[in-house]
Structure formats: C-alpha cells, structure tokens
C-alpha cells in the first residue's frame, strides 16, 4: 500500500542567524509530518523567496513522497528553466521533501539515497580569520584538534574594500611554503582563492609554491568558461577543487568529462538539492572525481550533506567550521538537535529524516536583514571579485 502525504503549506524563513541570514524552508503535510530545507544563495534570499512563492502555487496538494517527479515539474514546467535563483529554491524544497519522506518511513535520509557507506563523515577545517603568520599557528591548532585536512585563505581575504591579487599571491605563497615545512607531508593542505585571480595570476601563484605544498587549489578563477580552467590546468599539476557555485548537473559536465578538476565542491543547497546532488555524484564517480562538498550554511545544510556524504562512495571531506560555533550559524537555541563534530568527523545520524529539530517559535520572531557581500576593488579603483 502506498503512503501519500499531501503538501498543505510551504513557509519560507529568511532570517538572521549568527552573522548572516539563513534561508530556511518548512513544508507541512496533511498527516502532520513536516520537513525542513535550506537554500544556499546567500545575499539574495528575497529573490529565492519570490521563486518559492511561484512554486508554492502548484505544489500545494501534491504528494510530498513523489520527490523525483516534483523536482522535474519544478525544473521543466517553465520556459526559462534553471539558473541559480530557481535552483536555490528547488534545493530547499527538495531537501525538505527528503526530510518528510524519511520521517514518514521512519528512516534516516541516507536510506533514501541508497544506504550508508560510511559510519562517520570526515571533515576539513579552515584557518578562518587568522591572517599571515597567524594562519600557520591556527593550522597547528587544527592539527591538535584532529584535523588532517586544512584549508587556508589568501592574504587579503578578510578585506572589506581592497584586494590586490599580485600582492596577495606573493605573500600567500610564502605562508603556505612555511606551513608545509612545519606541518609535514601527512596533512592535506589547500587554499580557497574564491575566484579572485585571472589565469595568469593563478599560474604565477602556483609557480611561487614549492613542489608538493598544496593538495588542492580551490576556485582560483571564475568558472563561466571551462576553457580558461583547461588553460590553467596545463600550467600546474596542483589538483583543482571547483563547483560550489554550480546550479545543475549540466554545469558540471565539461569539468567532469574533460578531467579539469579533481575535487567536486558541489553544494546541496545550490545544485538542486539531494536529488540533483546524487546525479552529480554518480557522474563524478564514473570519472574518478572525489566529492568535497561546500557547507558554509546552517545545520539543515550540514545534516543534508552528511546524509549525502554517507551514501556516496567517492567522498573526500566535508567543509566545516572549527569550532562550529564560530559564526553563530549553528545556534543551539534555533536548532536544539543538529549534527555535531566529534573530533574531525561527523557521526551519521540514524534518526528519521535529516535528524534536525528547529525551534520554529524562536525562528518566527527573527527578522530579515539586508546583507551584501563586500564590493571589492583593486588599488587602481577597478572592480574585482569577492
């Protein structure tokens, strides 16, 4: 006998939690089972809320258990399909539907994705706001906490106004060379340049590093043109970590099939939810690309990604913050039950659904605050990437 749960309400909560807004979504059903999702398009929450309003018009009354069909209807039932705003909305809805289905069947979400392939999910941590020589000291602290994969940020990353790439790459290369010398060869070291470099600047940066210093270089340049990454690929043998901004399996095609990147940074809250993430994971597995999911948001995103990571074979590390409370996104007053690090790993929850509890009454009291990412300029006054 089939189990049907009719969608009765969809409520977005774009609210301030920690240092930024979180876009949370609640879906209710006629049998009292609710699900929670999260969108990853930080800074454009109002746009996502508008898309959710459009989808709500035809989702009310549908069977929440038919996740794949609903995904296809949201994506295909319009002429101007896809794009980051719509996919961020689809992601939140898709994650919430998985939460509902898991609760309805009494199983954790990973069971809906094929079952658990690992008991714990290894994580990598970042040096955070620590700058310059302080980043190396922070890396030592992370090692002492048990992390064997550590990500650095470039010199100038924390600037709110000026970022000069050429100045950054020289100083950052010196710091990374020192870090490798002090930390040894066992630890995995990477850096996220947040697509702030040109091909020439990225190549120059790689050439300033000693051999074997970096295990991955994340988002050195913008991703709109795969051929640009192919050009950079010929200039360095450092593995690339790319994909946190991608909003569909189609956007991953050239990167996976041309062997451009070695670590796939997909974001379940941007790519189209767990439904789309599993398709990207399979494609990546076929081309021996490891998964290294983007996870910069709140506990809903973390929980969904932990279930995803548990269910796929080709997994490397999950992004985390150490300590998790650093930015306030995991505020336990809002999320009394949520994934928690144990050392440098996330245990995989066996609770039905995502395994997250949300204090909706407190959430409803919070307001939305407009937040804008820094608008960076070079020293000559020209605009550059954040």
Which positions does each model-derived feature cover?
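Flexible C-terminal active-site loop/helix
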Residues: 2-19, 30, 93, 299-386
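Conserved, mostly hydrophobic/aromatic
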Residues: 7, 32, 55, 93, ...
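Shared catalytic-loop signature of beta/alpha-barrel
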Residues: 27, 50-57, 69, 213, ...
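Metal- or metallocofactor-binding catalytic centers and their adjacent structured scaffolds
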Residues: 30-105, 386
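A cross-domain feature marking catalytic cores of carbohydrate-active enzymes
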Residues: 39, 125-129, 152-154, 191-195, ...
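Glycine-rich, aromatic-flanked loop segments that form ligand/cofactor-binding clefts
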Residues: 94-130, 134
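Metal-dependent enolase-superfamily TIM-barrel catalytic cores that perform enediolate-based chemistry
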Residues: 120-236
């Amino acid at each position: 006998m089939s189990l049907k749960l009719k969608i009765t309400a969809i409520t977005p909560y774009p609210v301030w939690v920690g240092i930024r807004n979180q876009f949370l979504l609640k879906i209710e059903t006629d049998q009292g089972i609710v699900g929670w999702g999260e969108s990853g398009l930080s800074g454009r929450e109002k746009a996502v809320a508008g898309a959710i309003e459009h989808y709500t018009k035809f989702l009310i009354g549908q069977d929440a258990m038919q996740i794949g069909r609903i995904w296809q209807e949201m994506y295909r039932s319009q002429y101007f399909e896809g794009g980051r705003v719509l996919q961020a909305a689809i992601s939140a809805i898709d994650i919430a539907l998985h939460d509902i289905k898991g609760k309805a069947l009494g199983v954790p979400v990973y069971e809906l994705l094929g079952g658990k392939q690992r008991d714990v999910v290894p994580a990598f941590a970042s040096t955070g706001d620590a700058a310059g020589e302080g980043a190396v000291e922070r890396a030592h602290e992370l090692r002492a906490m048990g992390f064997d994969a550590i990500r650095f940020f470039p010199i100038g990353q924390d600037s709110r106004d000026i970022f000069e790439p050429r100045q950054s790459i020289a100083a950052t290369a010196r710091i990374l060379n020192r870090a490798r010398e002090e930390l040894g060869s066992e630890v995995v070291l990477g850096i996220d340049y947040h697509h702030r470099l040109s091909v020439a600047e990225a190549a120059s940066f790689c050439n300033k590093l000693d051999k074997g210093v970096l295990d991955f270089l994340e988002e050195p340049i913008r991703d709109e043109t795969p051929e640009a990454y192919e050009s950079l690929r010929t200039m360095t043998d450092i593995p690339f970590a790319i994909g946190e901004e991608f909003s569909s399996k189609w956007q991953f095609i050239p990167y996976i099939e041309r062997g451009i990147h070695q670590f796939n940074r997909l974001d379940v809250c941007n790519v189209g939810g767990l439904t789309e993430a599993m398709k990207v994971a399979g494609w990546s597995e076929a081309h021996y690309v490891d998964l290294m999911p983007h996870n910069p948001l709140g506990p809903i995103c973390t929980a969904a990604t932990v279930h995803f990571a548990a269910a796929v074979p080709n997994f490397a590390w999950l992004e985390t913050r150490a300590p998790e409370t650093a930015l306030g996104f995991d505020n336990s007053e809002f999320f009394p039950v949520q994934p928690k690090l144990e050392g440098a790993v996330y245990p995989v929850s066996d609770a039905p659904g995502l395994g997250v509890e949300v204090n909706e009454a407190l959430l409803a009291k919070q307001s939305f605050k407009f937040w804008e990412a820094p608008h960076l300029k070079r020293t000559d006054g020209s605009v550059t990437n954040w």
